[in-house]
Design a protein with these regions (language model features):
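Bacterial N-terminal signal peptides that target proteins for export
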Residues: 1-12
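Bilobed "Venus flytrap"/periplasmic-binding protein-like clamshell domains
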Residues: 30-56, 60-61, 120-187, 279, ...
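Pocket-lining segment of extracytoplasmic ligand-binding domains
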Residues: 89, 100-101, 130, 166-257, ...
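A structural signal for short loop-to-beta-strand junctions that line the ligand-binding cleft
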Residues: 104-117, 122, 239-248
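Ligand-binding clefts/hinges and TM-proximal coupling segments of bilobed small-molecule sensing domains
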Residues: 141-158, 230-300
């Protein structure tokens, strides 16, 4: 072997050794946060999460994706097109069961739980001029029930079924995101909107400052007919401008969900960082005040991701 050949062989050996210690380009962790419409609560909370992860997970690249929310988010996770997503609990349950009528092609068996976060209040709001004050008053009126194949739309179906009504009782049904629904009401082209979101959602606040509204009650007796995971709650008086009295309605828990393909360490860090940065979450939207690690496993409808499980064991929440 010539000296030049020996030098080349040595260089190749050193290069190979260094390669074994270098960080491959594929090790960069991309984190796509699946949220909902930009006028809802999922979106600002998702932005906050993205910023928390970008600053706390070394080598991560984060992105926030606006979607049609729960159903779309869960389908995207199953396809590996997101790393963490917001979803309503009943949607998660139906996805795990493979409920095709709810918009799932089959059992979404790759989904894994991260945390229960805050309740979504089912908020039915009508313009005062529409005369709609009760669920029965919606008969013959126009109502937006949320984007097609969204968790909100599934909530709408459950509420009407419990009340002995269906979409056929309405004058017109629109399948629109929150902000678009509000714009139609402002323009007198729609009577009411049903929005499943955290209290103080921006779209309804916007509507309430633009015209007089009625917040329509969903009586506790109707909520009881639906059963779990729905619970009877109250929208406090003055949550929205002109809402002088507390209003009964239903609520469903929200969850953060991931999928089995996301590495354990990444999910561990995502879970840990969220709970360590709750003030930033609350600053993005007041709904985050309800996020509590002690309640993070309440009602979890699917198996936990090992990374989340590791965090809860370290925190003493899971034995």
């Amino acid at each position: 072997m010539t000296s030049s050949t020996r030098r080349a062989a040595a260089a190749a050996a050193i290069s190979l050794a260094l390669a074994s210690f270098s960080v491959p380009a594929s090790s960069q962790q991309f984190i796509n946060v699946l949220t909902g419409g930009t006028s809802g609560v999922y979106y600002p909370l998702g932005v906050a999460l993205s910023e928390i992860y970008a600053g706390g997970i070394s080598g991560s690249r984060t992105q926030v994706q606006a979607t049609k929310a729960s159903v779309e988010n869960l389908n995207l996770l199953q396809q590996g097109k997101g790393e963490i997503a917001f979803s309503l609990g009943d949607s998660v349950q139906m996805a795990w069961e493979g409920n095709t009528e709810a918009g799932f092609p089959g059992k979404l068996d790759k989904l894994r739980g991260v945390a229960a976060i805050y309740p979504n209040y089912i908020q039915i709001v009508a313009s005062a001029d529409s005369g709609v004050k009760t669920l029965a008053d919606l008969k013959g009126k126009s109502l937006s029930v949320g984007a097609p194949a969204s968790g909100t739309e599934l909530n709408a179906r459950a509420i009407f079924k419990a009340a002995g009504m269906s979409y056929q009782d309405l004058g017109k049904v629109e399948y629109l995101p929150f902000a678009e629904s509000v714009e139609l009401i402002k323009n007198r082209q729609l009577d009411a909107t049903l929005q499943s979101a955290g209290l103080g959602v921006a779209s309804i606040r916007d509507l309430a400052t633009s015209l007089k509204i009625n917040v329509v009650a969903v009586p506790g007796s109707e909520v009881a007919k639906i059963g779990s995971p729905y619970i009877a709650v109250t929208i406090p008086a003055n949550t929205y401008e002109g809402q002088a009295e507390a209003v009964e309605t239903a609520a469903v828990g929200n969850f953060l969900i991931t999928h089995e393909g996301v590495p354990e360490e990444v999910v561990y860090q995502m879970t840990k960082l969220m709970f360590e940065n709750l003030p930033k979450m609350v600053a993005s939207h007041a709904a985050a005040k309800a996020i509590d690690p002690a309640k993070a496993l309440d009602g979890m409808p699917i198996p936990l991701h090992p990374g989340a499980e590791r965090y809860y064991k370290e925190a003493g929440i899971l034995k």
